[in-house]
Amino acid sequence: MAGQKIRIRLKAYDHEVIDSSAKKIVETVTRTGASVAGPVPLPTEKNVYCVIKSPHKYKDSREHFEMRTHKRLIDILDPTPKTVDSLMRLDLPAGVDIEIKL
């Protein structure tokens, strides 16, 4: 697998969960002998939803809810077969979305 690169994108609503997951991935990859670039924090996506408080009138009375999606990027340079195997076995929390590109 010489000359290849694995790119991992992590997404989560909680920044503490995503940071601990990124730390776990970096530790696992460095233990197997591959080099790591990252975790790189990507821009946080913020969705704001505006809802009228009352069920049928009083349009001036509104409530705002926001949902933040935190993102991280990790590049693994020159991965070994042992690196790929350890990444497949890695157990991460349920609140983290993982995209792996070879």
From Swiss-Prot:
It comes from the Bacteria. GO terms for molecular function: structural constituent of ribosome; tRNA binding. GO terms for cellular component: ribonucleoprotein complex; ribosome. Involved in the binding of tRNA to the ribosomes. Part of the 30S ribosomal subunit. GO terms for biological process: translation. Belongs to the universal ribosomal protein uS10 family. InterPro entries: Ribosomal_uS10, Ribosomal_uS10_CS, Ribosomal_uS10_dom, Ribosomal_uS10_dom_sf. Keywords: Ribonucleoprotein, Ribosomal protein. Gene3D superfamilies: Ribosomal protein S10 domain. This is Small ribosomal subunit protein uS10.
